[in-house]
């Protein structure tokens, strides 16, 4: 029964990856067409374009790795497995930093705080987006290189695993992976929670101000607050289980866990990227309108 559940989780994982690939390809193509047509692109769309490309490559790599792992009857070289792991770590870290940068941009642009720091960020963050995107890539490259450096002290075994024989031995490399993940994800988590909290606080102040002035509080600014807040909250709901599941998958005792636990970890690990990509399309006016036209929902 548990084997059937695990097999179903693998099938669901493949389906979710296909959905994620299609969604991110859609995000990339729409923003690319807008960029080419108007010869300009907004700061948020520039981040979404970078995020779409990164997630498309990451999910494609994950899908290829899953298919290869399930279908291969031969032993897998440690170098090929290490290549998959390192590429996935770099792309995953880059995509998470891009989302963090997107949340920071929404927080700075939408909130109405009058603090000098916020006013300075409002004026200067948009022109700095290309450099900040490059910084995200460099940070991801640094954490990946840190993993490589630390893993040199505990090299991988020569061969990883056969389809029906031994399991992959990652006990020696677990410390380096945990350090890399914690260094990258903890700062991202703090920034995203802070951005969401500031946005919620700003929305509450805005509603109180509208009520005090005896005017309707549902206006374009309120709608922008709510839309960005929903996207951030849903991101955190998907991101927290994803981070835990991803970390558990690399723990030494993961290979000895029951099929049910492995299935749950697999589902949570693959649900985040496709789910958040769908949420981006739903909450982004241009992407939502284009998607409706494609699906023939527009009358």
From Swiss-Prot:
It is found in: Membrane; Cell projection, Cilium membrane. Pfam families: TAS2R (PF05296). GO terms for biological process: respiratory gaseous exchange by respiratory system. Residues 1-9, 68-81, 153-172, 252-262 are extracellular. Belongs to the G-protein coupled receptor T2R family. Several bitter taste receptors are expressed in a single taste receptor cell. This is Taste receptor type 2 member 4. It comes from Pan paniscus (Pygmy chimpanzee). The gene is TAS2R4.
């Amino acid at each position: 029964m548990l084997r059937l559940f695990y097999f179903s989780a693998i099938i669901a994982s493949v389906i979710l990856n296909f959905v994620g690939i299609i969604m991110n390809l859609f995000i990339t193509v729409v923003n690319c067409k807008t960029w080419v047509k108007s010869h300009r692109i907004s700061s948020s769309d520039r981040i979404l374009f970078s995020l779409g490309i990164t997630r498309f490559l990451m999910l494609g790599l994950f899908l290829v790795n899953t298919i290869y792992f399930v279908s291969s009857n031969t032993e897998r070289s440690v170098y090929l497995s290490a290549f998959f792991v390192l590429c996935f770590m770099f792309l995953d870290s880059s995509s998470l930093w891009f989302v963090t940068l997107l949340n920071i941009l929404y927080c700075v642009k939408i909130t109405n705080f009058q603090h000098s720091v916020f006013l300075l960020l409002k004026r200067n963050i948009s022109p700095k987006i290309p450099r900040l995107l490059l910084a995200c890539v460099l940070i991801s490259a640094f954490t990946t290189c840190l993993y490589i450096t630390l893993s040199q002290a505990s090299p991988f075994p020569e061969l990883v695993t056969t389809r029906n024989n031994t399991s992959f031995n990652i006990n020696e490399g677990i410390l380096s992976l945990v350090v890399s993940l914690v260094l990258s994800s903890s700062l991202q988590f703090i920034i995203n929670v802070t951005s969401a909290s500031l946005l919620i606080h700003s929305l509450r102040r805005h509603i109180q101000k509208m009520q005090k002035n005896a005017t309707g509080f549902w206006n374009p600014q309120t709608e922008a607050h709510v839309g960005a807040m929903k996207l951030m909250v849903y991101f955190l709901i998907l991101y927290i289980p994803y981070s835990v599941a991803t970390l558990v998958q690399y723990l030494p005792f993961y290979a000895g866990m029951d099929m049910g636990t492995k299935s749950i970890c697999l589902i949570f690990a693959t649900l985040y990227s496709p789910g958040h990509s769908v949420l981006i399309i739903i909450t982004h006016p241009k992407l939502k309108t284009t998607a409706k036209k494609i699906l023939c929902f527009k009358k």
